[in-house]
Amino acid sequence: MNKNIVIKGAREHNLKNIDLTIPRDKLIVFTGLSGSGKSSLAFDTIYAEGQRRYVESLSSYARQFLGQMEKPDVDYIDGLSPAISIDQKTTSRNPRSTVGTVTEIYDYLRLLYARIGTPHCTKCGREITQQTVDQIVDRVMELDKKTRIQILAPIVKGRKGEFVKELDGIRKSGFVRVRVDGSVYDLSEEIKLEKNKKHNIDVIVDRLVINDDIKSRLTDSVETATHLADGNVVVDIVGDREELFSLNYACPEHGAVIEEMSPRMFSFNNPFCACKKCGGLGSYKEIDPNLVIPNKKLSINQGAVKASGWSVKDGAIAKMYFEGIAKEYGFSLDVPVDMIPKDGLRAILYGTGGKKLKMKRVTSYGTGDYQTDFEGVIPNLKRRYESTSSEWARGDIEAVMTTCTCPDCKGARLTPEIMSVTVGGKNIYEFCSMPISEELDFVNNLELTSRQQMIGKLVINEIRQRLSFLNSVGLDYLSLAREAATLSGGEAQRIRLATQIGSSLMGVLYILDEPSIGLHQRDNDKLLGTLKNLRDLGNTLIVVEHDEDTMRAADFIVDIGPGAGINGGELIAAGSVDDIINCERSITGMYLSGKRKIPVPEKRRNGNGKKLTVFGAQENNLKNIDVEFPLGKFIAVTGVSGSGKSSLVNEILYKYLANVLNGAKKRPGKFEKITGVDNLDKIINIDQSPIGRTPRSNPATYTGVFNDIRELYAQTPDAKQKGYKANRFSFNVKGGRCEACEGDGIVKIEMHFLADVYVPCEVCGGKRYNRETLDVKFKGKSIFDVLEMTVDEGAEFFEAQPKIYRKLKTLQDVGLGYIKIGQSATTLSGGEAQRVKLATELSKRSTGKTIYILDEPTTGLHTADVHRLTTVLDMLVNAGNTVVVIEHNLDIIKTADYIIDLGPEGGKGGGTIVKTGTPEEIADCENSYTGQYLKPLLKK
């Protein structure tokens, strides 16, 4: 078997005919600048070819269901194993997917609870057990000798009635005594019961004294009692206590029955066992009055009501109803909403409850008065939401809806009967709600009977193993109940990594995309240990990574570069860490050797003296903390994974400020108040989501520079002569675009059993525009020629056009000079998309009162890109703005003016402020994990 993977002539995307040999069964790191071609080589070439070969081995019938993979642009690859990609892009958005279901641990839990779980009565909490007559007799015979007992048949439990028929029946059956509501009666006497009172009736079947000779008689008496009372029997230990027994899986006191348990009973996707109100989701959507009227300082006439169809600007009907309510409840539509009487506001939101309003109808025929009631904005929205079949209409109403925990199941997703089943004193939801670290402790310390141990041993081992794997990749703070849709890309990737370790496969080629993302430096060693374990099983790992510790732990490093885009795509160096360091062309090597580094600022900014303060932050695991954000500074929010950073910044700070400053409709996390908002005028969240989801979106359209370019072309003599306006130069509308390809420049040809083929449009030759439009030139270049230019070329070409040049210059400033002006948004990496957004902000005129939020902006960035990012962020702060980043990257953290370090641990062990202050102050804090790793960097 070939000991190497040999690649010849790799040309996918920007790769420049790369030849490369990498060793098998090793930990290999692919590194290089963002956009250099690492992912093109790892995912789009090596993984794509491995997948394609597997799919090609299947029948044509099977291939039509799997979809075809296009052959990557490479001459030859030898030594490939079956390839598994573990990236960050495939997190399930299904609300039914949880960490437990994704890892399949929940399947094992369902099996465990079905086989050894103990059901309880939902009313009294009594343990429900299924017993035979012999087991009941054996339990009774364990009582001390000479103990006096009564065998009772509980025929009536807490029911109203006179029960004449029942009493007559047991009298005819030959029984002598009966106990009614605790008092013993002789059946020969007349027993009258109050009809409207609840009664308990027990037939006294036998009276015995415990000794060795009564077993046969006791058995007969128990059988008689269970026959009378539907399988139930009460053993009254005279002068002591009573014990209830049942032949059924039912509470002998309340009759709560549970069917024989099976794994499917514990699935919240099973309609018979899922909570009836939420259908197994654990939550439901409801209209939030705070989103219907987000700003109570506005009046109704100023448009305070933001709900679909109910703004006074939407039409006369809304205004007509609101005027009727205002007249009825005595207020003006021009006063702020928070000054409207409570009953008046309630009538607007929830209706008049049948009370008639005096309305005035105004039509073209005249005016008239009439009376009608009003159902209310919220009931109206709810009715429309439930009745409409239009996705657009539902989406419009969902803008004012919020997700709430189901009041019936409290988020547990299952019925009370299923939730009553416990193992080790915890039901399945209580177990899944604990952090993984606590779940592991619980499983390790589970006390079981010998029978339970024998039945559950294998299942418990599987659960323990999988929890250990999740723990080993730094996910100990997550819970199995956590929705998969709420996971970050890094968390989702590490979950899949843990699942793969659990499969214990050998001879597989794993390709991972930055597994260290979202991981605190403290947990990085755990991750590296996990990767090495996967390698030691006999697998090859290719890891696309920028983390220095991962590179130093690798067996082999491949450095792609030297630059990005058209300036990248070359093999710079391949070998050990020392080989990379000794390569003069390697930018990675320069940072590894320390020849280049991101400097620590000589002094920290003082800010503008103003501050933004969050009081009583309690979202998720935040422990009622007060946090100050000094304005005019670069602020880093740090802490181990799960310490509460996103809860504070994204859920509370961003959502609240977006509502107040930008008029958004978001539901912030739980907090008491936020002060200092009047010192800001805008909040902007710059994340790594795509700048567009179709090939028609590109950096030019996103930054707005394409509008300026089209305006410029419309001003050329040729365009004026032909009467062309700016829209003539858009490839999105009819007129100037090529109609054969509708402005795409390419045409799709379906090949059925082969991959679809995309070929250049024959009419326009791939140039997207028709001939007349392309004939219009500026400085000898058509509009298509401009879109094909790199940003660097465009900046030089438009140097004399200030509006265009300024926007292109900001793209250069953020290090995107290599991308094409018209490059499809779908081909940009997350880091590149984020920098396009940063450039767009830099090109705007700053008021100096903006706060920028960035969540792990270093994702996908090489150290050289991080260096450039710090420069860009400095530009934003130097303009008087405030930048808040959630970050684990120490190179970013050390350049901050102010750090808010949360922790000390993740999950329940987090949610408090460990330390705030400058990086130097954090480094001096012994309790701060961040400070411990930061200290050596500040000394360099």
Regions found by a protein language model. Give the residues of each.
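Conserved phosphate-binding elements of NTP-dependent enzyme cores
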Residues: 1-940
